Amino acid sequence: MRKLLTTFVCVWFTLAVWAGDGIYEKLQQIPQISEIQKLDVKPFQEYYQFWFEQPVDHSDPAKGTFRQRVLLGHKQSDAPVIVELEGYNIWSSEEGELANILKGNQLTIEHRFFDQSVPEGGIPWENLTIKQAADD
């Protein structure tokens, strides 16, 4: 998760600096992101579901990749970013409690190998470890 979180922190700082372009265009420029879908979720000004490509095994990238589901709710570039890490699945696309209280943007990440964030061809259970999840 640390690599994914680091990537998204960098994305958010970049988003705050890039004036004029929409979030959609900015997300399209990140090579690991695919299938960006705009959704209408209030109170966010922009809201997207997309997939982030991750290695199945961070210690052996030759084992292939899987797509991890991510939801991004954007209110404004100078708002804090609340990161929600979801196990089992993403239960709701609604604004979370902290995003509501802090009037923040929200990044919701589905845990590896749960719900829609699974490799094609089955789950290699030996790669569902705390270390692998932390490396995501």
Model-identified regions with their sequence ranges:
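Catalytic-loop region of hydrolases
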Residues: 19-105
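Glycine- and acidic
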Residues: 119-126
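Conserved alpha/beta-hydrolase
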Residues: 101-118
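Active-site-proximal flexible loops/turns
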Residues: 9, 93, 115-117
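Bacterial Sec-dependent N-terminal signal peptides
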Residues: 1-22
